[in-house]
Amino acid sequence: MPDSIKKELTRPYGFLFTNNDIFINFILEKKNNRLITVGDVVTSTLYDRNIIPFLSIIDGKTKRQIKVKTVNENVIKVKNEKSTIRFSVMKIIKNLLDKNERATILVDGEEDLLVIPVVIFGRNNDIIVYGQPNAGAVVIINNHFVKIRVKQILEKFYVKKC
Protein backbone atom coordinates (compact mmCIF):
# COMPACT_ATOMS: atom_id res chain seq x y z
CA MET A 1 0.00 0.00 0.00
CA PRO A 2 1.45 3.37 -0.96
CA ASP A 3 2.07 5.84 1.89
CA SER A 4 -0.20 8.36 0.14
CA ILE A 5 -3.23 6.20 0.95
CA LYS A 6 -2.50 5.68 4.65
CA LYS A 7 -3.79 9.11 5.70
CA GLU A 8 -6.87 8.70 3.52
CA LEU A 9 -7.70 5.41 5.22
CA THR A 10 -7.50 6.83 8.74
CA ARG A 11 -10.82 8.65 8.38
CA PRO A 12 -14.11 6.80 8.93
CA TYR A 13 -16.02 5.89 5.74
CA GLY A 14 -19.42 5.50 7.37
CA PHE A 15 -21.26 6.33 10.57
CA LEU A 16 -18.87 6.57 13.53
CA PHE A 17 -20.39 5.30 16.79
CA THR A 18 -18.61 6.26 20.00
CA ASN A 19 -21.35 4.91 22.29
CA ASN A 20 -21.79 1.12 22.39
CA ASP A 21 -25.49 1.24 23.34
CA ILE A 22 -26.35 3.48 20.39
CA PHE A 23 -24.17 1.30 18.14
CA ILE A 24 -25.92 -1.90 19.28
CA ASN A 25 -29.38 -0.36 18.87
CA PHE A 26 -28.50 0.71 15.32
CA ILE A 27 -27.30 -2.81 14.48
CA LEU A 28 -30.45 -4.37 15.97
CA GLU A 29 -32.61 -2.09 13.81
CA LYS A 30 -30.84 -3.53 10.76
CA LYS A 31 -31.20 -7.19 11.83
CA ASN A 32 -32.64 -8.24 8.45
CA ASN A 33 -29.44 -7.18 6.66
CA ARG A 34 -26.30 -9.31 6.47
CA LEU A 35 -23.86 -8.16 9.14
CA ILE A 36 -20.14 -8.29 8.39
CA THR A 37 -17.48 -7.31 10.92
CA VAL A 38 -13.80 -6.58 10.44
CA GLY A 39 -11.83 -6.31 13.66
CA ASP A 40 -11.59 -8.01 17.02
CA VAL A 41 -13.10 -5.29 19.22
CA VAL A 42 -16.24 -4.68 17.14
CA THR A 43 -16.76 -8.42 16.68
CA SER A 44 -16.34 -9.07 20.41
CA THR A 45 -18.70 -6.21 21.29
CA LEU A 46 -21.41 -7.79 19.14
CA TYR A 47 -20.74 -11.34 20.41
CA ASP A 48 -21.11 -10.05 23.98
CA ARG A 49 -24.65 -8.91 23.07
CA ASN A 50 -25.45 -12.23 21.34
CA ILE A 51 -25.32 -10.63 17.90
CA ILE A 52 -23.59 -13.07 15.57
CA PRO A 53 -22.26 -11.56 12.35
CA PHE A 54 -22.82 -13.34 9.06
CA LEU A 55 -19.08 -12.94 8.39
CA SER A 56 -16.40 -11.93 10.90
CA ILE A 57 -12.81 -11.14 9.99
CA ILE A 58 -10.47 -11.08 12.98
CA ASP A 59 -6.77 -11.47 13.69
CA GLY A 60 -6.86 -12.23 17.41
CA LYS A 61 -4.85 -9.11 18.25
CA THR A 62 -6.02 -5.79 19.61
CA LYS A 63 -4.63 -2.87 21.58
CA ARG A 64 -7.11 -3.76 24.35
CA GLN A 65 -6.02 -7.42 24.59
CA ILE A 66 -9.55 -8.71 24.00
CA LYS A 67 -9.74 -12.41 23.22
CA VAL A 68 -12.37 -13.06 20.57
CA LYS A 69 -14.01 -16.43 20.56
CA THR A 70 -15.18 -17.72 17.21
CA VAL A 71 -18.82 -18.73 17.21
CA ASN A 72 -19.21 -19.63 13.56
CA GLU A 73 -18.50 -23.31 12.94
CA ASN A 74 -16.88 -22.42 9.62
CA VAL A 75 -13.48 -20.94 10.58
CA ILE A 76 -11.12 -20.21 7.70
CA LYS A 77 -7.48 -19.43 8.46
CA VAL A 78 -5.66 -17.10 6.08
CA LYS A 79 -2.39 -15.20 5.90
CA ASN A 80 -2.45 -11.47 5.19
CA GLU A 81 0.54 -9.24 5.92
CA LYS A 82 0.39 -5.67 7.28
CA SER A 83 -0.56 -3.03 4.67
CA THR A 84 -1.53 -5.84 2.29
CA ILE A 85 -4.61 -7.34 0.72
CA ARG A 86 -3.70 -10.77 -0.58
CA PHE A 87 -5.49 -11.81 -3.75
CA SER A 88 -6.08 -15.26 -2.24
CA VAL A 89 -7.91 -13.67 0.72
CA MET A 90 -9.97 -11.50 -1.63
CA LYS A 91 -11.07 -14.66 -3.45
CA ILE A 92 -12.12 -16.32 -0.19
CA ILE A 93 -14.14 -13.26 0.85
CA LYS A 94 -15.77 -13.07 -2.58
CA ASN A 95 -16.69 -16.78 -2.53
CA LEU A 96 -18.19 -16.61 0.96
CA LEU A 97 -20.25 -13.53 0.14
CA ASP A 98 -21.35 -14.86 -3.26
CA LYS A 99 -22.38 -18.22 -1.78
CA ASN A 100 -24.04 -16.53 1.21
CA GLU A 101 -21.93 -18.72 3.49
CA ARG A 102 -21.50 -17.83 7.18
CA ALA A 103 -17.91 -17.91 8.44
CA THR A 104 -15.19 -16.46 10.59
CA ILE A 105 -11.95 -15.62 8.82
CA LEU A 106 -9.02 -15.83 11.23
CA VAL A 107 -6.14 -13.80 9.85
CA ASP A 108 -2.50 -14.56 10.54
CA GLY A 109 -1.23 -11.02 10.13
CA GLU A 110 -3.46 -8.00 9.81
CA GLU A 111 -7.14 -7.76 8.90
CA ASP A 112 -7.70 -3.98 8.81
CA LEU A 113 -7.59 -3.52 5.03
CA LEU A 114 -9.92 -6.45 4.39
CA VAL A 115 -12.82 -4.02 4.71
CA ILE A 116 -11.97 -3.12 1.10
CA PRO A 117 -12.85 -6.49 -0.50
CA VAL A 118 -15.84 -6.82 1.86
CA VAL A 119 -17.28 -3.58 0.46
CA ILE A 120 -16.45 -4.45 -3.14
CA PHE A 121 -17.89 -7.99 -3.01
CA GLY A 122 -20.67 -7.34 -0.51
CA ARG A 123 -24.28 -6.78 -1.46
CA ASN A 124 -26.10 -3.49 -1.40
CA ASN A 125 -27.51 -2.93 2.11
CA ASP A 126 -25.02 -5.26 3.80
CA ILE A 127 -24.07 -3.75 7.16
CA ILE A 128 -20.27 -3.60 7.37
CA VAL A 129 -18.70 -2.75 10.72
CA TYR A 130 -15.06 -2.06 11.44
CA GLY A 131 -13.13 -0.54 14.32
CA GLN A 132 -11.81 3.00 14.22
CA PRO A 133 -8.79 3.01 16.56
CA ASN A 134 -9.19 5.25 19.61
CA ALA A 135 -12.65 6.34 18.41
CA GLY A 136 -15.30 3.63 18.13
CA ALA A 137 -17.12 1.52 15.57
CA VAL A 138 -17.72 2.57 11.97
CA VAL A 139 -20.84 1.27 10.23
CA ILE A 140 -21.17 1.28 6.45
CA ILE A 141 -24.49 0.53 4.79
CA ASN A 142 -23.07 -0.86 1.58
CA ASN A 143 -24.21 0.69 -1.68
CA HIS A 144 -23.07 1.48 -5.21
CA PHE A 145 -21.46 4.79 -4.23
CA VAL A 146 -19.41 3.29 -1.40
CA LYS A 147 -18.24 0.54 -3.77
CA ILE A 148 -17.09 3.13 -6.33
CA ARG A 149 -15.14 5.06 -3.68
CA VAL A 150 -13.49 1.92 -2.32
CA LYS A 151 -12.56 0.76 -5.84
CA GLN A 152 -10.91 4.16 -6.40
CA ILE A 153 -8.84 3.61 -3.28
CA LEU A 154 -7.92 0.06 -4.29
CA GLU A 155 -6.74 1.30 -7.70
CA LYS A 156 -4.00 3.27 -5.89
CA PHE A 157 -2.51 0.07 -4.46
CA TYR A 158 0.29 -1.69 -6.29
CA VAL A 159 0.56 -5.39 -7.04
CA LYS A 160 3.52 -7.43 -5.88
CA LYS A 161 4.21 -11.09 -5.33
CA CYS A 162 3.86 -12.30 -1.73
From Swiss-Prot:
Domain of life: Archaea
EC number from the UniProt entry: 2.7.1.237
Key word Transferase present: yes
InterPro entries documented for this protein: GTP-dep_dephospho-CoA_kin
Coiled coil location: none
Pfam family, one: DUF359
Pathway membership, UniProt: Cofactor biosynthesis; coenzyme A biosynthesis
Residues the record lists as binding GTP: D40, V41, V42, D59, K61, E111
EC top class named in words: transferase
Catalytic activity reported: 3'-dephospho-CoA + GTP = GDP + CoA + H(+)
Keyword entries, A-Z: Coenzyme A biosynthesis, GTP-binding, Kinase, Nucleotide-binding, Transferase
Molecular-function GO term, any one: kinase activity
BP terms from Gene Ontology: coenzyme A biosynthetic process
Record-stated family: Belongs to the GTP-dependent DPCK family.
Function comment: Catalyzes the GTP-dependent phosphorylation of the 3'-hydroxyl group of dephosphocoenzyme A to form coenzyme A (CoA).
The name this protein goes by in its record: GTP-dependent dephospho-CoA kinase
Source species of the chain: Sulfurisphaera tokodaii (strain DSM 16993 / JCM 10545 / NBRC 100140 / 7) (Sulfolobus tokodaii)
